[in-house]
UniProtKB/Swiss-Prot annotation:
The species this protein was found in: Staphylococcus saprophyticus subsp. saprophyticus (strain ATCC 15305 / DSM 20229 / NCIMB 8711 / NCTC 7292 / S-41)
Transmembrane segments: none
Summary of the function given for this chain in its UniProt record: Bifunctional serine/threonine kinase and phosphorylase involved in the regulation of the pyruvate, phosphate dikinase (PPDK) by catalyzing its phosphorylation/dephosphorylation.
Domain of life according to the entry: Bacteria
PANTHER family, alphabetized: PYRUVATE, PHOSPHATE DIKINASE REGULATORY PROTEIN 1, CHLOROPLASTIC
Record field: catalytic activity: N(tele)-phospho-L-histidyl/L-threonyl-[pyruvate, phosphate dikinase] + ADP = N(tele)-phospho-L-histidyl/O-phospho-L-threonyl-[pyruvate, phosphate dikinase] + AMP + H(+); N(tele)-phospho-L-histidyl/O-phospho-L-threonyl-[pyruvate, phosphate dikinase] + phosphate + H(+) = N(tele)-phospho-L-histidyl/L-threonyl-[pyruvate, phosphate dikinase] + diphosphate
Gene Ontology molecular functions: ADP binding; ATP binding; phosphotransferase activity, phosphate group as acceptor; protein serine/threonine kinase activity
Protein name according to UniProt: Putative pyruvate, phosphate dikinase regulatory protein 1
Length: 271
């Protein structure tokens, strides 16, 4: 970002008792407002363990005329850093303590003062992304190779909310596979190999499913009778579904007039 032969226009020291990602993001967001600054040096000092280490870094910042940016959650580190920065007369920006103090004052809630809490949130974020990718891959019986990795398997006839429920749970970090139950298609042997799989069977009354399928047919602009929205066919499918539920030892959930959130809440309790 800068020429070794020339002093940078701006030096920034990023100090944190965690990885320091929060401060780096704030710095990069701020620097976008200064496109004319071409020579910038950013030095990172993550995982600060003691005040002596902090003091050494601040003295070095004084020597190099650097701006210090911190996300120190440990209040003792913060106080020590602020005092020395004031004594050394160096710019010291503390992203965490002011906002923590204001939120504490407004809510009367005490902060956990845990370093790396944001990183844990990031880990949860990536877990959700992985779960979403899994749910898409294993939606509607598309794949079975790694179905044993699923936190839950959802099975049911068409229009019992298998996909919406899978995606909702995936957004909460659960790996969900779902398989449609069709009269002419057997459940793959691969599914029966994984005895640990928690299986949930979705069902509803024939009238309820018929109404939903009729609406689906209208949306698709189709006309004329078909097996898809035939009451006799739906009854056969539901009888077949009950047999499959028993074979898979599935927990049965009636989704009739039930929100996705309600069904998901029940599944979460079972996981």
């Amino acid at each position: 970002m800068f020429d070794d032969q020339q002093a940078p226009q701006l030096r920034l020291f990023v100090i944190s008792d965690s990885i320091g990602e929060t401060a780096q993001r704030m710095i990069h967001a701020t620097l976008t407002q200064f496109p004319d600054i071409s020579q910038i040096e950013i030095k990172k000092y993550p995982f600060i363990k003691n005040e002596e280490e902090l003091m050494h870094i601040l003295n070095r910042a004084k020597e190099l005329n650097a701006v210090v940016v911190t996300t120190l959650v440990n209040p003792d580190f913060n106080i020590a850093g602020q005092h020395l920065a004031k004594k050394l007369q160096i710019p010291y920006i503390d992203y965490m303590s002011d906002l923590i103090g204001i939120i504490q004052q407004q809510t009367q809630c005490n902060p956990i003062l845990e370093s790396g809490a944001l990183r844990k949130l990031d880990e949860n974020y990536f877990k959700r992304i992985e779960a979403m990718e899994y749910a898409v891959k294993y939606d509607d019986g598309k794949h079975f190779t790694d179905i044993g990795e699923a936190d839950a398997l959802i099975v049911g006839v068409s229009r019992t909310s298998k996909t919406p429920l899978s995606m909702y749970l995936a957004n909460k970090g659960y790996k969900i596979a779902n398989i449609p139950l069709v009269l002419e298609v057997d459940i793959p042997d691969e599914v029966f190999k994984h005895k640990h799989l928690k299986v949930f069977g979705l069902t509803a009354s024939p009238d309820y499913i018929l109404n939903i399928r009729n609406e689906r047919v209208k949306i698709l602009g189709l006309s004329g009778p078909s097996n898809y929205n035939s009451m006799d066919r739906i009854r056969e499918e539901l009888i077949h579904a009950e047999e499959v539920f028993e074979k898979l030892n599935a927990t049965v959930i009636n989704t009739e007039y039930k929100s996705i959130e309600e069904s998901a809440f029940y599944i979460e309790k079972c996981l």
